[in-house]
Amino acid sequence: GYNNIVLQDGMSIKRVIDANERLQVWADTINNATFNSSPLSPLEKYLLAYKYVTRFIYNDAENKTVSRRVSSILNSNGNNIVCLGYAALLSELCKKIGIPCAIQYLDDATEKYARHANAMVYLKDEKYHINGAYISDPCFDSKQPTRASKHIHGMLKLNDAEKIYKNLNMD
């Protein structure tokens, strides 16, 4: 069978399928969740997805073939993940729960923000009167060895995100 087929990056097809199944379990959990006996709204689904992603601990002693791809991250139990990996994982999970989300690469003329990625999520939720695009940076909110995950950078308005990134020391 496919168990012995290895992809170019050295991961077997079986491990890719296993990772996709794990991601689908998360998506099914979110899609089937209820609050006060009602299905979750789009915002509530997104916040739950964000919580799943931010529970991984950032590891900057990265392996470029592991820390950026969803299947590799999930097969390493999140032990190897960097900003692009967080953005990719959030983007894939959001797509599975019906929320538009894309990876966004930060770059500017000074290259101060080069080599950082986050996600752009579009939320339309009548329950909370939300309709717009938001920057989401699960890397900055990720769990750390000394603290739990937080949710400060989960839904930044575009103009607020610009202010925050200008004040960051990313060196």
Language-model segments: what does each one mean?
Residues 1, 10, 33-37, 98, ...:
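Short, flexible coil/linker elements and helix-boundary hinge sites characteristic
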Residues 1-23, 83, 89, 140, ...:
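Intrinsically disordered, low-complexity repeat and linker tracts
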Residues 9-76, 130:
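Secondary-structure boundary elements
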Residues 39, 80, 149:
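Flexible, glycine- and charge-enriched loops at secondary-structure boundaries
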Residues 42-49, 79-94:
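Active-site nucleophilic cysteine motif
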Residues 50, 54, 84, 95, ...:
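Residue-level recognition of well-ordered secondary-structure positions
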Residues 60-72, 77-80, 97-112:
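Catalytic cysteine-centered active-site loop
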Residues 85-163:
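Hydrophobic/aromatic-rich core segments of domains that either
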